[in-house]
Amino acid sequence: MRLAFWLYEGTALHGISRITNSMKGVHTVYHAPQGDDYITATYTMLERTPDFPGLSISVVRGRDLAQGVSRLPSTLQQVDHHYSPDLTVIAPSCSTALLQEDLNQLAAHSGVPSEKLLVYALNPFRVSENEAADGLFTELVKRYAVAQEKTPTPSVNLLGFTSLGFHLRANLTSLRRMLEALGIAVNVVAPWGSGIDDLAKLPAAWLNIAPYREIGATAAAYLDETCGMPAMYEAPIGVEPTTAWLRKLLDEINRIAGQKGLSRLAMPAPRAFSLDGLSAPSGVPWFARTADMESFSNKRAFVFGDATHTVALVKFLRDELGMQIIGAGTYLERHADWVRKELDGYLPGELMVTDRFQDVAKFIDDQMPDLVCGTQMERHSCRKLDVPCMVICPPTHIENHLLGYYPFFGFDGADVIADRVYLSCKLGLEKHLIDFFGDAGLEYEESDDAAKAEPDQPVSNAHGHTESKTVSQGEPIASDEGGISWSDEAETMLKKVPFFVRKKVRKNTEDFALGIGESCVTAEVFRKAKESLGG
């Protein structure tokens, strides 16, 4: 029944295809029933790249099963003949797991050389998107990385950047710009844009950069263990974390340079990291001290997402923008302990760990924060609740796969995040001003006069008779929640409250009324509630 609802993580195939679709000369054959190759539509809709997804399906049909035959060998032959990939990854499905088919034996009967095939054997019932992607990438690194001499000059690998990654290309551009300013070359970016030959060159770099907790960190740990390659796992999101990240990177590079007897690299002037090369690298430090942003110290924020972005955004909102964090959570249970450790001292209560979007929506509805940083799921939930929301991580939609330069990494990314926080919280004022001063003919909302002009609507009762439904002008209006009624005067006063906090004010006022034993919110009760709640 869970499939009837939205899910935060995709299937194992989703994770496998994110790796193979990122790479050159790598193809995926999915052994599954017809229709399970729907994932190709996701890439063509969101990825915005000229290449068609490298994914084919080996159809499992009832007739074939009855005859005791499989289409997998012939599908592998067709893929090898038509696409000529360097590697074909064979992915199991829930159907093949139930049928207990031996994919290795079926692949061996295809006649395709074994070195060009990889059966990624996992349990599709237990493994989901991120774990499958991280596991496959690590498997490929183990298979193809070859120990070799280091590059003569400082170089790094950028690991974990995958197809459908959040602001993928912009983040890569931001990292490349900072590395270029430091005088550090990029040896390999993987899996994005890499081939089998590139994976073989991974050990030539001086160190690995794996900023995503979800994908790439396991491969970096393997290279550290087997090839003695140090790794950096921090994500440079925010001004302070980026500054610390640059210092740590330079320290690591200079330590290795010292062992090699090479000259040390120096930290360039801050303006070297700016877009124009002349100004400060980020506007966040001064922007956070402006009158507009200082008012954010009273705003309450809730953050929910994957491990990497949840940790980064909580720290950015509190440390750099001064917002109050009322809660945070992640849908990745396997990384929950790491998130708890990183956010120790940042949260007023327990970390929310759930993969049910309904639980997150209920928390938002109960707390009514001033800003939600979450996924596409939270964007939908917040739209119903009139709560400002910005998307910070997958799952995403088309507006988070942009052609323009909107990174989250580095100093440039700090500016992008600050802009989105500010605009998400402030743009609602425009609608409030229209509500308050009138629409000036824009017809933004249905006017009260039009509502009053509507004729009484006939309502059919339980016996089939028609009655006229009227509400007298002075009769209190019952609230949908809790049975508390509101007088016309109190409703008029409530309409003067900005729409983006109106629901929260209504709820708090009704709670206050119940607390003092009132069953109807009058103008006097509304004023008392306002005074009591500090309004």
UniProtKB/Swiss-Prot annotation:
Which top-level group of life is the source organism from?
A: Bacteria
Which is one GO molecular function term here?
Answer: metal ion binding
Q: Which Gene3D superfamilies match?
A: 1.20.89.20, Nitrogenase molybdenum iron protein domain (3.40.50.1980), Proto-chlorophyllide reductase 57 kD subunit B (1.10.8.550)
What positions does the entry give for [4Fe-4S] cluster binding?
A: D36
Per UniProt, the keywords (alphabetical) are:
4Fe-4S, ATP-binding, Bacteriochlorophyll biosynthesis, Chlorophyll biosynthesis, Iron, Iron-sulfur, Metal-binding, Nucleotide-binding, Oxidoreductase, Photosynthesis
Entry's EC annotation: 1.3.7.7
Q: Which reaction does it catalyse?
A: chlorophyllide a + oxidized 2[4Fe-4S]-[ferredoxin] + 2 ADP + 2 phosphate = protochlorophyllide a + reduced 2[4Fe-4S]-[ferredoxin] + 2 ATP + 2 H2O
What biological processes does GO assign it?
A: light-independent bacteriochlorophyll biosynthetic process; photosynthesis, dark reaction
- Binding positions (substrate): G428, L429
Pathway annotation: Porphyrin-containing compound metabolism; bacteriochlorophyll biosynthesis (light-independent)
Q: Fetch the InterPro entries from UniProt.
A: ChlB/BchB/BchZ (IPR050152), LI-POR_suB-like_C (IPR013580), Nase/OxRdtase_comp1 (IPR000510), P-CP_red_C (IPR042298), Protochl_reductB (IPR005969), Protochlorophyllide_Rdtase (IPR016209)
For this protein, the record's Pfam families field holds: Oxidored_nitro, PCP_red
- Keyword Iron appears in the UniProt entry: yes
Give the signal sequence positions: none
Location of the active site: D292 (proton donor)
Cofactor binding note: Binds 1 [4Fe-4S] cluster per heterodimer. The cluster is bound at the heterodimer interface by residues from both subunits.
Q: Which residue ranges does the record annotate as region Disordered?
A: 447-483
So what does this one do? Component of the dark-operative protochlorophyllide reductase (DPOR) that uses Mg-ATP and reduced ferredoxin to reduce ring D of protochlorophyllide (Pchlide) to form chlorophyllide a (Chlide). This reaction is light-independent. The NB-protein (BchN-BchB) is the catalytic component of the complex.
The annotated subunit structure for this chain is:
Protochlorophyllide reductase is composed of three subunits; BchL, BchN and BchB. Forms a heterotetramer of two BchB and two BchN subunits.
**Family matches, as PANTHER family:** LIGHT-INDEPENDENT PROTOCHLOROPHYLLIDE REDUCTASE SUBUNIT B
The family assignment reads: Belongs to the ChlB/BchB/BchZ family.
**Full protein name:** Light-independent protochlorophyllide reductase subunit B
Q: What is the lineage of its organism?
A: Bacteria, Pseudomonadati, Chlorobiota, Chlorobiia, Chlorobiales
Give the gene symbol. Answer: bchB
